[in-house]
């Protein structure tokens, strides 16, 4: 009996455990492979690589990290999602809901909704960053802060884009690859497994969103990422096409990358990270909430009309 037929009949629980194993093996394999690739391409001995990767201000280090990050994303999300879809169904395109295209109008409305949501996302992130754990968990909170600070240093280094070439590569690495891989894995596989396991699609959406947010290990952005994950799950539920959450995910990440590039090169005066924050931007925030809600309602209606 073909391997895919065996796993197609297994319980969601056993499928989930298999999924964890496939993800871990693939992530480690591709990270190691990309590490070997950079040592070969750049002629750097393996024993020197670890020390080099600590200096994120070094342009060569950034190139190495971007290659490794690209390989890691492919190995952690894209490859496991495709493999698991094959094992669980046999037709990955059907299982991941890639065959059905979302209506053009729903793509338009959802795209506009993601762009107008930026101030609202900034507010949620700001509120999340001000949350504190109880005093007895102070060591945990300090660890979370330290982890967040380290991640922020790397993110800031990645977003340093001196030329259009760096912008294009970041759009590929930060926007396109995650939009494909994370949606295939979390919405295409994980959400489906938890929906089958619980018998409730709502449980699948929120369980996948919870894991999606936790996976990023950025604790002070947990709430907005959780809500974003849930929204992406509902987009899949409403449309039956993974192309809609993929577009929304891409635009969310791409907007941040493009805004950072424009701000760095003084092509826009407003800092995109503070848009919607502060009492003087109340009207901007209000407009963001109203327009985002309106666009997503229109997107939902058009997605469900097909």
Show the residue positions of the predicted features.
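Alpha-helical transmembrane segments and their helix-start/interface "positive-inside/aromatic belt" motifs
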Residues: 6-27, 97-116
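Hydrophobic core of alpha-helical transmembrane segments in multi-pass integral membrane proteins
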Residues: 23-32, 78, 82, 113-117, ...
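Alpha-helical transmembrane segments in multi-pass membrane proteins
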Residues: 35-88, 106-115, 136-141, 145-146
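Juxtamembrane helix-loop-helix connectors linking adjacent transmembrane helices
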Residues: 49-57, 94-177
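Hydrophobic alpha-helical transmembrane segments
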Residues: 61-76, 148-177, 277-290
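Membrane-interface helix/loop boundary segments of multi-pass membrane proteins
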Residues: 181-207, 234-240
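Functionally important transmembrane alpha-helices
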Residues: 213-275
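C-terminal membrane module of polytopic membrane proteins
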Residues: 250-306
């Amino acid at each position: 009996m073909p391997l895919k037929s065996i796993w197609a009949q297994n319980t969601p629980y056993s499928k989930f455990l298999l999924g964890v194993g496939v993800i871990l093996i693939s992530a480690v394999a591709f990270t190691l492979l990309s590490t070997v690739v950079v040592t070969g391409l750049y002629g750097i001995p393996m024993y020197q690589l670890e020390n080099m990767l600590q200096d994120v201000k070094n342009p060569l280090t950034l190139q190495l990290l971007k290659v490794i990050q690209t390989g890691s994303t492919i190995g952690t999300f894209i490859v496991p999602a495709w493999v698991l879809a094959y094992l669980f169904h046999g037709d990955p395109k059907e299982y991941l809901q890639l065959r059905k295209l979302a209506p053009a109008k729903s793509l338009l409305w959802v795209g506009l909704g993601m762009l107008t949501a930026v101030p609202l996302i900034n507010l949620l992130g700001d509120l999340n960053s001000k949350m504190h754990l109880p005093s007895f968990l102070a060591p945990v909170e300090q660890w979370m802060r330290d982890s967040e600070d380290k991640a922020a240093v790397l993110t800031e280094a990645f977003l340093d884009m001196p030329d259009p070439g760096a912008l294009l590569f970041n759009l590929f690495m930060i926007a396109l690859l995650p939009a494909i891989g994370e949606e295939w894995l979390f919405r295409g596989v994980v959400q489906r497994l938890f929906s089958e396991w619980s018998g409730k699609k709502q449980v699948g959406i929120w369980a996948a969103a919870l894991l999606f947010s936790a996976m990023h290990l950025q604790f002070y952005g947990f709430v907005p990422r959780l809500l974003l994950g849930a929204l992406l799950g509902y987009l899949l539920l409403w449309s039956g096409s993974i192309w809609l959450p993929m577009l929304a995910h891409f635009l969310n990440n791409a907007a941040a990358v493009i805004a950072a590039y424009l701000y760095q090169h003084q092509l826009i005066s407003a800092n995109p990270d503070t848009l919607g924050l502060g009492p003087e931007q109340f009207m901007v925030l209000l407009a963001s909430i109203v327009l985002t809600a309106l666009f997503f309602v229109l997107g939902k209606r058009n997605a469900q009309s097909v």
